């Protein structure tokens, strides 16, 4: 059984999208990769619409079993975080409309899964994604490589077997702590 994962490195300026097929033996093959760009001159609603339309097209064309999205962190500046969060929301909603499970992975989880180090730089991630997927050339820009890395991370962390399509199966301790904290915060409201 092959698992198809659509990975998304969300962003308003550049949104990386990659589709990977992963076999039970963890062998991965790139199906497609690209970047959706939006102009800063467009209004926010128009930028999100461009991303939404592209994501809809990718989901319908590639029919993934699961969507893996980079989890937003507040370490960045506020305007960057907002843009990433808004783009993430568009992606998550598009998948939800189709009944496709969504999993969120932190940048550190992705780096660790692909390179073995949670502090690896973008060049190391790109180099290993290129090697793992047996590509002739590195995916460019880095957002494209990051999207493929997200897809690989989800498949490997969730296990490419039966429960892999579920966004909540096989959570890491950090993901479990995060999910528990979010659930606790929701109960307090």
Curated annotation (Swiss-Prot):
Q: Which residues form the active site?
A: 9, 70, 143
Under catalytic activity, the entry for this protein gives: Endonucleolytic cleavage at a junction such as a reciprocal single-stranded crossover between two homologous DNA duplexes (Holliday junction)
Q: Basic and acidic residues bias located where?
A: 179-189
Q: Which GO terms describe its biological process?
A: DNA recombination; DNA repair
The listed locations are: Cytoplasm
Q: How is the cofactor bound?
A: Binds 2 Mg(2+) ion per subunit.
Note the InterPro entries from the entry: RNaseH-like_sf, RNaseH_sf, X-over_junc_endoDNase_Mg_BS, X-over_junc_endoDNase_RuvC
Per the record, which residues fall in region Disordered? 162-189
NCBIfam families reported for this sequence = ruvC
Described function: The RuvA-RuvB-RuvC complex processes Holliday junction (HJ) DNA during genetic recombination and DNA repair. Endonuclease that resolves HJ intermediates. Cleaves cruciform DNA by making single-stranded nicks across the HJ at symmetrical positions within the homologous arms, yielding a 5'-phosphate and a 3'-hydroxyl group; requires a central core of homology in the junction. The consensus cleavage sequence is 5'-(A/T)TT(C/G)-3'. Cleavage occurs on the 3'-side of the TT dinucleotide at the point of strand exchange.
Question: Which named protein is this?
Answer: Crossover junction endodeoxyribonuclease RuvC
Q: Which gene encodes it?
A: ruvC
């Amino acid at each position: 059984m092959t698992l198809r994962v659509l990975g998304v490195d969300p962003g308003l300026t550049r949104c990386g999208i990659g589709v990977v097929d992963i076999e039970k033996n963890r062998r991965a093959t790139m199906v497609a990769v690209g970047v959706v760009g939006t102009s800063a001159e467009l209004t926010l609603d128009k930028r999100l619409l461009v991303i939404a339309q592209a994501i809809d097209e990718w989901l319908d064309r590639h029919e993934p079993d699961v969507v893996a999205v980079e989890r937003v962190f507040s370490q960045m500046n506020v305007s960057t975080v907002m843009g990433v969060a808004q783009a993430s929301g568009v992606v998550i909603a598009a998948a939800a409309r189709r009944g496709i499970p969504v999993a969120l992975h932190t940048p550190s989880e992705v780096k660790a899964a692909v390179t073995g180090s949670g502090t690896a730089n973008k060049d190391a991630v790109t180099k290993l994604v290129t090697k793992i997927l047996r590509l002739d050339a590195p995916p460019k820009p880095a957002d494209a490589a990051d999207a493929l890395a997200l897809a690989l991370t989800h498949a490997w962390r969730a296990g490419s077997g039966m429960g892999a399509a579920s966004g909540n199966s096989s959570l890491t301790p950090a993901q479990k702590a995060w999910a528990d904290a979010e659930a606790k915060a929701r109960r307090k409201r």
